[in-house]
Amino acid sequence: MALTYKKAGVDISKIKQSQKAIGKLITSTHKLQKKAKIAHGFGHYAGIVEIPGGKMLATHTDGVGTKVVISNLMKKYNTIGIDCVAMNVNDIICIGATPISFVDYIAANKNDVPKFKKIVEGLVTGAKKSAMPIVGGETAIMPDVIEGEGFAYDLAGMVVGLVEKKDLVLGNKIKTGDVIIGANSTGIHSNGYSLARKALLKKYSIKDKIKGVGVIGDALLKPTEIYTNPVLEMVQKCKINGLAHITGGAFTKLLRLKNTGYQIDSLPKIPPIMELIQEQGVKMKKCIRHSIWE
C-alpha cells in the first residue's frame, strides 16, 4: 500500500480548513491602521502594505518544519539556519521585493550554547547570501512545550522587504503564451520531511550510505537554495509576469498566481534522494504534490 502524507500524520485537507478559518479572522484586521493601506494580504507569498512615501512594505514568516528532526538525528546544526532564511526570502522575492531585514525565533527544550551558535551560523550564512541584515530574534527555552530526548528545537523567522509599487509582481498579468522558466533545487529543500522520514527510516538508518545518494542524512540536510540575487536581477532586467516558489503544493503553486492552465514539457532530472523515496512506496504524484521534489 502506497505511503501518503496523510498516513505520515499530515492531513492537507484539514490544514486547508484551518487556513480558511484563520484567513477570515486575519482579514478582519486589515483596516485597523490608517497609515498603511493593505495592497495584498492573506494568501499570497507576502503581505503587502503601502507605506508613506509610496513604497510597498512586504512581510513574510516561515520555518523549516520537521527538517529539524534530521538535524538532530545527524547532530548537525550549522546549515539549518540557511534553510530558515531561504524559506523566507524565496517567498518574499516572488512579489519582486528586496529583503531588507530578518528576525529569527528559536524554541528549544533546554539551553545549549554550542548548538545555538551553530544554528545562528547558518542564519548568518543565509543572510550574507541574501545581502540582508539580521536585526533581532528570540530564543525561548520551553521544556514543557518542546519535548524530546536530549536537545529538541524548532526554528522559524520573519523577513521584511521593500518594493516600488510599479515593480510589484503579483501574477495578475500572466497570460496565454507566457514561458515558464524553472530553477534547479539542491534537493528536497524544506518541505515533505514528515513523509520522507516515514518512507526512508522504516528501512534505512539516517547514516546509511546509498549508491548515487550518499549518506541519507546528508542528502536530506542539503540546504535550501537561496534565489534572491538571480531572481531580483531577472526582475530588474526582464518583464516578469509571475513568480512562484515551489514548496508545499509543488507545481500547483502556479495556479495560485492566476487560474491559467499551463504545460510543463521539460522537467529536470529526478534527484537521487527522491528516487530512493519512491522506491519505498511513495508515488511520483505524492512526491511532486508535497514538494519532496522541487
Label every PLM stretch briefly:
Residues N90-T98, R256-L257:
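Alpha-helix C-terminal capping segments
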Residues T176-D218:
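Acidic, glycine-rich loop-and-beta core segments that form the ion-binding/anion-interacting portion
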Residues G43, M56, V64-G65, K75, ...:
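Glycine-rich anion-binding loops of enzyme active sites
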Residues A2-G9, K115-P133, I146-L155, K203-L221, ...:
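Glycine-/charge-enriched secondary-structure boundary and capping motifs
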Residues A2-C94, A131-M132, M142-V145, K175, ...:
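N-terminal glycine-rich phosphate/pyrophosphate-binding loops that anchor nucleotide-derived ligands
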Residues G63-K76, D104, K211-V215, G281-M284:
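Glycine/charged-rich beta-loop-alpha catalytic/anionic-binding loops adjacent to active sites
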Residues S28-K35, K166, M284-C287:
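Active-site phosphate-binding and catalytic loops of NTP-dependent enzymes
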